[in-house]
């Protein structure tokens, strides 16, 4: 991937919140040291990661966030367990105001036929595997526009974390999907995840009444 404005923006948006959470668990001097090292790790991870389509692919954002999480984890150099890193990630992002705005905007468009038709096309296209490091998915229409499903056959986040030798972070990041659903104003049902060794991830979203 390119270390472009998009990649820099993810770091700029979230690094302050990560620093605040790390101060709680590691203390201010260590938190500052970890975040200084994080910027170097993040840049290297982004540059050595294969592209999944850049800003043209909405899921690039997910992979960039995973790269930042991996960078913080590596920069902590054993001072955070995977579970602690998962909590740090969840708390940091949930306390970022831009995240809440983004999820509210996401909810408005995701529960429309126009977005769902576009997402279905993206899912069909993903099976061509033009970007091997990316996601492969199927889209499932609900009975109304107020519900839909996405079944992931391959996960770009899991692939990145595996390449970076920190696959143990994947199940922790999966838990954040339920936080995202909360801010989207919907219920998420999921019985399987690739991160936990299943063959797929079966997301089902239903808008709250």
Give each language-model segment a name:
Residues 22, 72, 76, 127-128, ...:
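Hydrophobic, Leu/Ile/Phe/Ala-enriched alpha-helical segments that form helix-helix packing faces
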Residues 1-76:
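N-terminal, charged low-complexity regulatory/assembly segments
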Residues 56-64, 161, 165, 169, ...:
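Conserved aromatic-histidine-acidic binding/catalytic patches
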